[in-house]
Amino acid sequence: MALRCINNLEIFLRRCTAPTLHRCCVASSRTAHTASSSKGSGGDNSKDQENNGQNKSGYRRFGWRSVFQFCVPFSLGALVSAVLIEGHRDELTPTISARSLKGRRNEFNFIADVVAGCGDSVVYIEIKDTRHFDYFSGQPITASNGSGFVIEQNGLILTNAHVVINKPHTMVQVRLSDGRTFPATIEDVDQTSDLATLRIHVSGLPVMKLGKSSTLRSGEWVVALGSPLALSNTVTAGVISATQRASQELGLRNRDINYLQTDAAITFGNSGGPLVNLDGEAIGVNSMKVTAGISFAIPIDYVKVFLERAAERRKKGSAHKTGYPVKRYMGITMLTLTPDILFELKSRSQNMPNNLMHGVLVWKVIVGSPAHSGGLQPGDIVTHINKKEIKNSSDVYDALAEGRKDLEIVILRGVKQMHVKITPEDP
């Protein structure tokens, strides 16, 4: 700042010296000429020349003196001001600094803390088709997949029943979070509650803690862990939307369960995985998804009852390894369209027919299954089977139980009505 002021002062002096000096000299010359005229013109030329010399030296002294008398105080004042301003620049200029965000990651990363505490107990479940093999590897192809979690160190795993049963000519494999893979056997199944346990022959596994679903509140944070679309170790988060969603509201007439509803992102492959609270405890088993933001989990309190009964059967030596009834295999996971679910679907999609009042939503089709071969796709709505109106999932099971070789199915795909033919596999 001081250097800038000195430069400006030098420029000012250069500009003002010549014109100012010229004006001062002209003024002095005129004054001297007037004085000599008043004394008369009788003087000789030598005296006039002397006077003229004196006047010239006089106006020179008068011009430079005027310039420096004006400029020196000004320059000194400007220089002092510049020094003072430069020395107090920090005081004159307000300091604005961004608010420090350091430490926020550790303070608010509660989701990461949950995953770190219980994520190792979550497993990926694959159902291998023993009749079809990969061309390059020669290994059985994957017919379907799901999730589960370890509940005992000696290899007991909890999952959904629909993940592992009603799939003939298949075998079950479990992949742990560390990448190890083991064959698994089905120990206990409850198709009514859609729960099952698997066993792998390994010990010392990390175990998921089981919490209490009865203490949950709507709006409470939860974390869904699993393997959606075969992507292992996937984490999504959301809140509990409802704690008492009756199975009748979902069209599941053969079940007496009050489901947990959550908006945590859940999709195909999440089935059987844990829904965890912020204490790292499983408070539900992810079971089904209706649409984005609407998913359901089986409450862990209901699961505990199933596990207690299964433990009693194992003590008596009557575990259900093969004792569950095997139905004709179609290869879909479905959900009854209740009025509430229909309203939600219509509000979220413009492709839903306004006159649709009931039906069954196909939300998963197993690759290579009869349904897949027949042309069914996720999102299709089944309205009729063999010319009979379908109002809920029980009607589909009844159609399978009739034993007819082929099923003539009418579906809605968006707003378009279509016909497909499926030949279910016998057990």
Curated annotation (Swiss-Prot):
> Where are the residues of the annotated region Disordered?
33-57
The processes (GO biological process) annotated in the record are:
apoptotic process; positive regulation of apoptotic process; proteolysis
| Record flagged with keyword Repeat | no
Which Pfam families does the entry link to? Answer: PDZ_6, Trypsin_2
Q: What Enzyme Commission number(s) does the record list for this chain?
A: 3.4.21.108
The active site is formed by 162, 194, 271
> What InterPro entries has UniProt attached to this entry?
PDZ, PDZ_6, PDZ_sf, Peptidase_S1_PA, Peptidase_S1C
List UniProt keywords, sorted A-Z. Apoptosis, Hydrolase, Membrane, Mitochondrion, Protease, Serine protease, Transit peptide, Transmembrane, Transmembrane helix, Zymogen
Domain PDZ, which positions? 330-415
Gene3D superfamilies in the cross-refs: 2.30.42.10, 2.40.10.120
Segments traversing the membrane: 67-87
Which PROSITE patterns is this protein grouped with? PDZ (PS50106)
Residue ranges for motif IAP-binding? Answer: 78-81
Where found in the cell? Mitochondrion intermembrane space; Mitochondrion membrane
Family membership? Belongs to the peptidase S1C family.
Q: How does it assemble?
A: Interacts with th/DIAP1 (via BIR 2 domain).
Q: What is this protein called?
A: Serine protease HTRA2, mitochondrial
